[in-house]
A protein has these predicted regions:
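Hydrophobic h-region of N-terminal signal peptides that target proteins for export
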Residues: 12-20
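Short, hydrophobic/aromatic-enriched beta-strand segments in well-ordered soluble domains
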Residues: 39-45, 54-56, 95-124, 146-154, ...
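Juxtacatalytic substrate-recognition/specificity segment
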Residues: 193-302
Length: 302
């Protein structure tokens, strides 16, 4: 039996998360038309008083966003369903008074109706999850494995993300080695058009939400050229797989992540030469950040 580096990495992550301590999330959207995500966060191995928090910014966009303003209806309980006291101690931190040596479950909702590459968005048709704006962190345990289970509406079938899946079949469970990896991995949930292709021996996926006149073969050909050209500059691809997430609607903009990018493009960008070149420029720019900024950083930031 052959084991790749990636398969060994997954085995280590999954085994430690199943048998060791982890932070576990269930992300639901039972009424997506209300624009409210429902989150349940389990603090495995909590002891006494704990603190959870929501970031104020997201990887790739280094401005204060104040995501905590969208948090609603937060509560906490112990694993035996005892209600626990939880209070907000500053603008984005909450303190939970635990019950001895019992896991703590924190539940809350997040309003998500700001459509941009740096904010989460939910409606009856699809969801863009920017994890930093939805998934809180356990203040003292950000280095643990983080597991994410997703409950989607029954009529949605696709999840596109750079996170590693586990517990197949279904692919609604994902794992990150730590909180940093989790928040650097946005997710698109819907019935988006998905195209899989391979470049330089690595799998890539292109997910497009929104109808337009794009041609899969043309996009794959041009994206392949971009990937190959930029790889020549840096020497090799620094990831095992990569996801391009596109919202094909209005506006233009992108945000880089370690193994993915989120891009907003105009609906009719594909048969107009000027607009199509603008699209390719955006893709090239965001993909360049796979190395520059995401892997090559100032010494004080590393």
């Amino acid at each position: 039996m052959r084991f790749t580096v990636r398969s060994i990495y997954l085995l280590v992550l999954i085994s430690t998360s199943l048998w060791g301590k982890s932070v576990q999330y269930t992300l639901s959207m039972s009424e997506p038309h209300t624009h409210l995500f429902e989150v349940e966060m389990r603090l495995d191995g909590a002891r006494g008083t704990e603190v959870v928090a929501l970031p104020v910014w997201t990887p790739g966009s280094y401005l204060v966003r104040e995501y905590a303003r969208n948090v609603q209806d937060i509560s906490a309980r112990s694993e035996d369903d005892t209600v626990l006291k939880i209070k907000k101690i500053d603008k984005n931190h909450w303190q939970v008074k635990g019950k001895g040596r019992q896991d703590i479950i924190v539940s809350y909702r997040v309003y998500a109706y700001e459509h941009s590459v740096r904010t989460s968005y939910l409606n009856a048709d699809h969801a863009l999850v920017v994890p930093a704006s939805v998934l809180m962190y356990w203040q003292k345990n950000q280095q643990r494995n983080h597991q994410l289970h997703i409950n989607m509406p029954e009529n949605w079938s696709e999840i596109t993300t750079a996170l590693e899946p586990f517990n197949k079949p279904g692919n609604v469970d994902f794992i990150a080695k730590d909180y940093d990896e989790l928040v650097d991995s946005p997710l698109e949930l819907s019935n988006q058009h998905v195209v899989n292709f391979e470049v330089l021996g690595k799998p890539h996926v292109m997910a497009l939400y929104g109808a337009s006149n794009y041609d899969d073969s043309v996009l794959v050909s041009d994206f392949t050229k971009i990937i190959e050209a930029e790889t020549k500059i840096f020497g090799s691809l620094p990831y095992d797989h990569y996801s391009f997430i596109f919202h094909v609607e209005e506006g233009r903009g992108g945000l880089e992540h370690a193994n993915s990018s989120v891009n907003f493009i105009r609906r009719w960008s594909f048969n107009d030469e000027k607009r199509y070149k603008s699209l390719l420029s955006l893709v090239s720019h965001e993909f360049f950040h796979t190395w520059n900024v995401k892997r090559i950083v100032p010494k004080g930031v590393a």
